[in-house]
Design a protein with these regions (language model features):
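Nucleotide-activated donor-binding/catalytic signature segment of Leloir-type glycosyltransferases, i.e.
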Residues: 285, 290-309, 320
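Short alpha-helical donor nucleotide-sugar binding micro-motif in glycosyltransferases
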Residues: 306, 313-318, 407
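A short, well-ordered alpha-helix in the C-terminal region of glycosyltransferases
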Residues: 385-400, 406-409
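Carbohydrate-associated surface elements
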Residues: 193, 215
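Conserved donor-binding/catalytic core segment of Leloir-type glycosyltransferases
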Residues: 188, 238-259, 265-268
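Conserved acidic donor-binding segment of nucleotide-sugar-dependent glycosyltransferases
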Residues: 358-359, 363-370, 378-384
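Aromatic "clamp/platform" in nucleotide-sugar-dependent glycosyltransferases that forms part
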Residues: 326
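Short hydrophobic beta-strand element within catalytic cores of glycosyltransferases
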Residues: 343-346
Length: 426
C-alpha cells in the first residue's frame, strides 16, 4: 500500500509536525508512506520537496496581496485567512501517480491551490483531507471565532471588514462547495470538536467526517543538547528548592489573541487572591509584546522560543501544564505535557475534551470562567495522579501505532466501499 501525505512543511508548525509523525507511524506499520512538501527541514529520505523557489515565493506573495487589498490593508488579520487561489499543481508528480491513497494536510500559503486539489481528485484516487483547524469548513478563515457565517455560505467576512455578501470569503466558499462534490474525497477531523463544527458548517454538514486524532510517540523526541536549555533546567531545580510548584504554558506565540494570555493573567490573579500556594510560571514561546510579562502576578521565567525536543525536556520538570486558548482544535501541548508527567488544566471549549477526563486525568474549566480555571490550577497541584497514569492515557489514545492502525482501517473501509459500489454499478 502506497500513501502520500501532502503538507506545506514537514517540521514547521504543529500540523506539519503531526503529519510527519503520521508518516513515520504508517511506515512503522508496514505502509509505504511518503511526504511531499514545499519546505523540507528534516533529513528523512521519505520526504521530498517539490519547491520551486521563485514560483513558490510568487504564489505566497500573490495570495497575501489579494488578501491585503481586500481586508482594508490590515496586517493584523493578514495571516488569519487563506484563499488557496495560488499554489502548485503536483498531480503529475511520480509519487502522486504511484500512490494508492493521498492525504492532504495543511497546504496553504501557496503550497497547493484549490485547483491543484481538483487536479489530484480528478485522478480518481481515494483522497483524505485532514482537518487540523476550521479552514476546510469555512470560506477562508482558520478559526471562525464568534462568527457563524460558515453555517451559511460566508460573505460579510469580519476578518476582511467586509459589508458585502459576494466578498472573497463567499467566492472561496463557492469554490470549496464545487470541490467537495468529488466522491473520492474523504474528511478526517483531528478532534470531535472539529467534527461538531463540520456538522454546523453548510459546506460539510452533509459529508461523512471521521475522527482520528493526531499522534504522539516517545521515540519522536531526541535528547536536546543546548547550553541555554541546560541553564533553564538548572534554574528550574533552584526554583524547586524554594518549595514552589511549577506551571507551564507553551505556544509558538504566547500573546497570539487565540491563546488567551489575558485570561491566564486574570486566573493567576484570582489564584493568588484565593490560595496561599507558591507557584512559578514558565512561559515557553515567543512574545510580540513583552509588556505582558509585567502583568503576571507571580514569579515567572520567560524561556523564549524552544524547539519541540527542548519543550518536551522542560515539561519533564513541570507539575502542571496550562492552556487558556479561546479555540483549540486539538491541544498538542497538553498531550506532550501529560506524556512528560504534567497534570493538564484547560478550558472545555475545544479538542481538549478528547484529551482530558475531568478530575480524572486533568481539569476542564468552564469556558471562559477565570475563576474556575484558578480552581483547576489548585485542583491539579493537589492531585495525586501518577505520571504513569498520564503517560498511559496518552499512549493508549494518541500513541503512534494506535493512530496509524486507525488510518489503515480507514483505508480498508474506503477500499471496501469502493469495491461494493463498483459491484452495485455493474
Amino acid at each position: 500500500m502506497k500513501v502520500v501525505l501532502i503538507s506545506r512543511s514537514d517540521l514547521r508548525g504543529g500540523a506539519a509536525v503531526f503529519t510527519f509523525r503520521l508518516m513515520v507511524a504508517l511506515r512503522n506499520n508496514g505502509v509505504d508512506a511518503k511526504m511531499l512538501v514545499v519546505e523540507k527541514l528534516s533529513a528523512d529520505r521519505s520526504v521530498m520537496s517539490y519547491a520551486n523557489y521563485f514560483q513558490d515565493k510568487l504564489n505566497f506573495l500573490l495570495e497575501r496581496f489579494e488578501i491585503f487589498i481586500r481586508n482594508g490593508f490590515s496586517r493584523k488579520t493578514l495571516f488569519h485567512v487563506d484563499t488557496a487561489h495560488y499554489g502548485r499543481d503536483i498531480s503529475e508528480h511520480p509519487w502522486i501517480k504511484e500512490a494508492d491513497y493521498i492525504i492532504l494536510n495543511w497546504m496553504n500559503q501557496g503550497a497547493l491551490s484549490l485547483r491543484g486539489v481538483k487536479r489530484i481528485l480528478e485522478l480518481g484516487k481515494p483522497t483524505i483531507w485532514n482537518l487540523h483547524d476550521m479552514w476546510c469548513l469555512t470560506g477562508i478563515c482558520h478559526h471562525a471565532y464568534d462568527c457563524n457565517r460558515y453555517t451559511q455560505d460566508c460573505g460579510h467576512c469580519p476578518l476582511l471588514k467586509s459589508n458585502k455578501y459576494n466578498d472573497l470569503s463567499h467566492r472561496v466558499w463557492l469554490s470549496k462547495s464545487q470541490l467537495y462534490r468529488y466522491e473520492n474525497l474523504h474528511f478526517v477531523a483531528v478532534s470531535n470538536w472539529i467534527k461538531e463544527k463540520c456538522r454546523q458548517s453548510n459546506l460539510l454538514s452533509q459529508h461523512p467526517v471521521s475522527v482520528i486524532p493526531n499522534s504522539i510517540s516517545l521515540s519522536a523526541y531526541q535528547e536536546p543538547k543546548h547550553e541555554g536549555l541546560n541553564q533553564i533546567l538548572q534554574d528550574i531545580e533552584k526554583i524547586r528548592q524554594t518549595q514552589s510548584q511549577i506551571l507551564a504554558i507553551a505556544a509558538a506565540r504566547l500573546d497570539d489573541p487565540i491563546k488567551g494570555l489575558p485570561l491566564l493573567i486574570v486566573a493567576l490573579n484570582i489564584f493568588k487572591r484565593k490560595y496561599q500556594t507558591n507557584i512559578h510560571l514558565l512561559l515557553i514561546g515567543s512574545l510580540r509584546d513583552e509588556s505582558w510579562l509585567a502583568k503576571i502576578p507571580n514569579d515567572y521565567t520567560f524561556t523564549g522560543p524552544l524547539n519541540p525536543n527542548e519543550v518536551f525536556a522542560v515539561l519533564h520538570h513541570v507539575d502542571v501544564v496550562l492552556s487558556t486558548s479561546h479555540y483549540e482544535s486539538f491541544g498538542g501541548t497538553l498531550i506532550e505535557g501529560m506524556l512528560a508527567g504534567c497534570v493538564p488544566v484547560s478550558f472545555d471549549n475545544g479538542g481538549q475534551r478528547d484529551i482530558i477526563s475531568h478530575q480524572q486525568t486533568g481539569y476542564l474549566a468552564q469556558y471562559p470562567s477565570a475563576d474556575d480555571f484558578a480552581d483547576g490550577i489548585k485542583w491539579a497541584l493537589a492531585s495525586k495522579i501518577s505520571k504513569s497514569v498520564l503517560e498511559n492515557t496518552v499512549l493508549s489514545n494518541f500513541g503512534a501505532d494506535v493512530v496509524a492502525k486507525k488510518y489503515i482501517k480507514l483505508f480498508d473501509r474506503i477500499s471496501h466501499n469502493a469495491t461494493t459500489q463498483e459491484g452495485v454499478s455493474r
